[in-house]
UniProtKB/Swiss-Prot annotation:
A Pfam family that the UniProt record links to this protein: MJ1316
HAMAP family cross-referenced by the UniProt entry: UPF0248
InterPro entries the record matches: MJ1316, UPF0248
Name of the molecule in the record: UPF0248 protein PYRAB10580
Membrane-traversing stretches: none
Organism taxonomic ancestry: Archaea, Methanobacteriati, Methanobacteriota, Thermococci, Thermococcales
Signal peptide positions on this chain: none
Record-stated family: Belongs to the UPF0248 family.
Length: 83
């Protein structure tokens, strides 16, 4: 697993030319969805200061549970899950 904040990990995925954002997705806590989680491709999100955006919808970073590569490798995981 990579070290750093979820925002740092996402910034590396989105802006480092060695990474391909198409290869990653995030799992967020999303009440009302099946299992209360939602899978979102990294390519459709925009990073903000305390939030990330999907279109005009802003979602706080603390709702991200995992960042996962499409081969299933978890590259970042929330402390909520690690407990």
């Amino acid at each position: 697993m990579r070290k750093g904040t979820v925002k740092e990990v996402l910034a590396k995925i989105k802006y480092d030319p060695r990474e391909n954002e198409e290869d990653y997705y995030i799992i967020i806590e999303h009440r009302g969805s099946y299992g209360n989680v939602r899978k979102i491709p990294v390519r459709i999100i925009e990073l903000g200061h305390g939030y990330f955006f999907i279109g005009e919808t802003q979602i706080p970073y603390h709702r991200i549970l995992k960042v996962v590569r499409k081969d299933g490798k978890v590259v970042w995981e929330s402390r909520k899950i690690r407990k």
